Amino acid sequence: LKKIKNTDDGIITLKNSNDFNILSPEFKFVTNKYLIEIVSRYLNCVPILTNLSLWYSPNDKIFENSSQEYHLDHEDYKQVKGFLFINDIDEQTGPLSIINTLQSNEIQKSINYKMTKKTKRVNDEIIGDLIRKNINIQENVITGKSGDLLLCDTSSCFHYGSRLGTKARYILAFQYITPFGFTVDWNWRNYDKLPFKHLECENNLLLKKVLGIKI
């Protein structure tokens, strides 16, 4: 596979949204009715699929001020990111580490967290200081087998991944946000940057909504 993009945070994109179409097995998986129903219940609306990518993390370098440090994602107030494990992932494979919503809210209040380019990342020293102040913080390291699926609200839960390890990580990553996400224009059906709105999906009303196609 040809490397498309290195984000300078340890994640290399091997495939992006433009490499998938309505017949792709990966596309069919992330738009299947069962999965969309789960995400819809959490977001309280039919979500929009805004990204589908195949990620490769070599886990061989440290990148400062990157997704290797704790952070929240900014695309929406609530969102769901999916991570389908392509290979087995253990603690030496740069696994995703997550802090739950309640504890993440406490961290935000304690450090007056602001989601700007300079302050979005939170290093381990800051988290360690909070723990020493008896603030309850528990890191959940997500490991699993090939084929396992993780769904996470990365706008609400502090997280990091792709830290140094002895093995590489391959993940199919995808993202759902609400029609009113911060990165989507108010008239979201006319938002040209939605990656899948050009696809043909006649007679499938739910799929049209998920892709942002005008109904």
Across the structure, where does each feature detected by a protein language model lie?
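Short, conserved beta-strand element in jelly-roll/cupin
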Residues: E75-E91, T143-K145, L151, Q175-P179
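Non-heme Fe(II)/2-oxoglutarate
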Residues: I111-N112, L149-L151, S155-I215
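Double-stranded beta-helix
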Residues: Q92-C157
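Non-heme Fe(II)-dependent double-stranded beta-helix
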Residues: L1-Q68
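Active-site region of the double-stranded beta-helix
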Residues: C45-I48, L72-E75, I86-P95, T101-Q103
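Histidine-centered catalytic micro-motifs
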Residues: S67-H74, C157, G161
